[in-house]
């Protein structure tokens, strides 16, 4: 595994700004409101030829009894426990505080190497302020500015100096990317936690307690998976501030970089228009889709309950007729293993390649049974079809006139392909081209 570095400190010292600078993208929510980064966000960076993981933790408020801030403290402790080196960030503008002292005591107990980074030192004249941080009795304080980049290289030099370069193994780059998506409070974080066997992300009954998209790595049946637990998507009418706007965009971005989307529904509630909207993002992005109905343990049911719920899904999510439906419980683990098996199965279909000969044998059979349509005496002619891409499967169909290839006939060809080849869980993209057009 790659080395892991946790960025730890009290709220609003600039941890997320440093994290974003290190990984080169706006992964963590950055705002002036203390406590905005509620959870652990994981990214990857490289320095001096060494690739390592970086964890951005929520700010530690040592004295707060607020339920979210208490959970953030626990999450920071998890990050400390799983890290190899800790970057302890303090605020050079504010100076040393009692909260800094308490965090330092917490870190000292871990016995992990600590790099003390004094942030918001934007010019040389401000550097004398760093000396008060020697009182913490940790490593030499390093002046830096996460916003402007000065001193960041010095911090990273100190970090990599602690790494044992022998035996560092990289995480598989070809892992299957799985986005767990759904409206708030459907149990997305609980599902990820059950799979990982640890309280990896904050779980609370308060909707929206997972604000950012969080990557976790796990192997299932020897196959590496990257699980992306996303902020629950809210209806746009409720997205009234910057934090919610950032998170919605991040969730859509998580869908874009995934291979498979697990669309989580709350089995204790009817399928809603909001569920359909969220599922629509995954469908429009061309991702493999699995519908998982969570909290099934909390549903009063008889032998008809599952079928009745499936009818709701068919009505509200009619565009996902190809997606398998599983009834699960993230709380008890009911059918979670089956869900992971289905992820591997759908991914196999998502990457499936079919020879041109096989495709055209099926095409000939389909057009014989139900001949192509005609309009004003002109008959649609389908010359051949070939697969030109995967993730999702893309089929180029060459015809004499694209205008004659009506949607209804395209749907017929798609259904015939699905009947012959296994494309469970994945959309099929058709590229209609007139003969003579380039691939």
Swiss-Prot record:
Q: Which domain of life is it from?
A: Bacteria
Record protein name field? GTPase Der
UniProt binding sites for GTP 2:
182-189, 229-233, 294-297
Q: Where are the transmembrane segments?
A: none
Cited InterPro entries: G_ENGA, GTP-bd, GTPase_Der, KH_dom-like, KH_dom-like_a/b, P-loop_NTPase, Small_GTP-bd
Question: What GO molecular functions are on record for this protein?
Answer: GTP binding; ribosome binding
Q: Which organism is it from?
A: Caldicellulosiruptor saccharolyticus (strain ATCC 43494 / DSM 8903 / Tp8T 6331)
Q: Which GO terms describe its biological process?
A: ribosome biogenesis
What sequence ranges are listed for the domain EngA-type G? 3-167, 176-351
**Oligomeric and partner information:** Associates with the 50S ribosomal subunit.
Member of which family? Answer: Belongs to the TRAFAC class TrmE-Era-EngA-EngB-Septin-like GTPase superfamily. EngA (Der) GTPase family.
- Sections of the chain in a coiled coil: none
Listed A to Z, the keywords are: GTP-binding, Nucleotide-binding, Repeat, Ribosome biogenesis
Q: Which residues bind GTP 1?
A: 9-16, 56-60, 119-122
What does the record give as the function of this protein? GTPase that plays an essential role in the late steps of ribosome biogenesis.
């Amino acid at each position: 595994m790659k080395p892991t570095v946790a960025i730890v400190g009290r709220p609003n010292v600039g941890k997320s700004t440093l994290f974003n600078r290190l990984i080169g993208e706006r992964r963590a929510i950055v705002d002036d409101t203390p406590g905005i980064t509620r959870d652990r966000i994981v990214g990857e960076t490289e320095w001096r030829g060494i690739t390592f993981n970086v964890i951005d933790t929520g700010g530690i408020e040592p004295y707060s009894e607020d339920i979210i801030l208490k959970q953030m403290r626990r999450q920071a402790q998890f990050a400390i426990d799983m890290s190899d080196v800790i970057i302890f960030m303090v605020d050079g503008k504010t100076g040393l505080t009692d909260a800094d002292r308490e965090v330092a005591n917490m870190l000292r107990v871990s016995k992990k190497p600590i790099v003390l980074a004094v942030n918001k030192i934007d010019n040389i004249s401000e550097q004398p302020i760093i000396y008060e941080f020697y009182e913490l009795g940790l490593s030499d304080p390093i002046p830096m500015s996460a916003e402007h980049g000065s001193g960041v290289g010095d911090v990273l030099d100190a970090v990599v100096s602690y790494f044992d370069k022998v035996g560092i193994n990289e995480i598989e780059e070809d892992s299957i990317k799985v986005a767990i998506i759904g409206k708030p409070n459907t149990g997305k974080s609980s599902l990820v936690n059950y799979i990982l066997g640890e309280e990896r992300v904050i779980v609370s009954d308060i909707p929206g307690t997972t604000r950012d998209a969080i990557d976790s790595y796990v192997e299932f049946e020897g196959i590496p998976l990257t699980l992306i637990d996303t902020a629950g998507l809210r209806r746009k009418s409720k997205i009234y501030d910057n934090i919610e706007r950032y998170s919605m965009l991040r969730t859509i971005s998580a869908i874009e970089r995934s291979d498979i989307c697990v669309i989580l529904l709350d089995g204790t509630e009817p399928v809603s228009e909001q569920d359909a909207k969220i599922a629509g993002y995954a469908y429009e992005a061309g991702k493999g889709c699995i519908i998982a109905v969570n909290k099934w343990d909390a549903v009063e049911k008889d032998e008809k309950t599952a079928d009745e719920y499936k009818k709701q899904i068919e009505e509200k999510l009619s565009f996902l007729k190809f997606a398998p439906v599983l009834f699960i419980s993230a709380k008890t683990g009911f059918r979670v293993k089956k869900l992971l098996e289905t992820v591997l199965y759908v991914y196999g279909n998502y990457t499936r390649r079919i020879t041109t000969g096989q495709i055209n044998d099926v095409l000939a059979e389909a057009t014989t049974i139900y001949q192509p349509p005609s309009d004003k005496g002109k008959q649609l002619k389908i010359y051949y079809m070939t697969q030109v891409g995967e993730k999702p499967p893309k089929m180029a169909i060459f015809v004499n006139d694209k205008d004659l290839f009506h949607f209804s006939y395209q749907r017929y060809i798609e259904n015939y392909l699905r009947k012959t080849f296994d494309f469970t869980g994945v959309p099929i993209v058709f590229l209609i081209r007139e003969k003579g057009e380039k691939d």
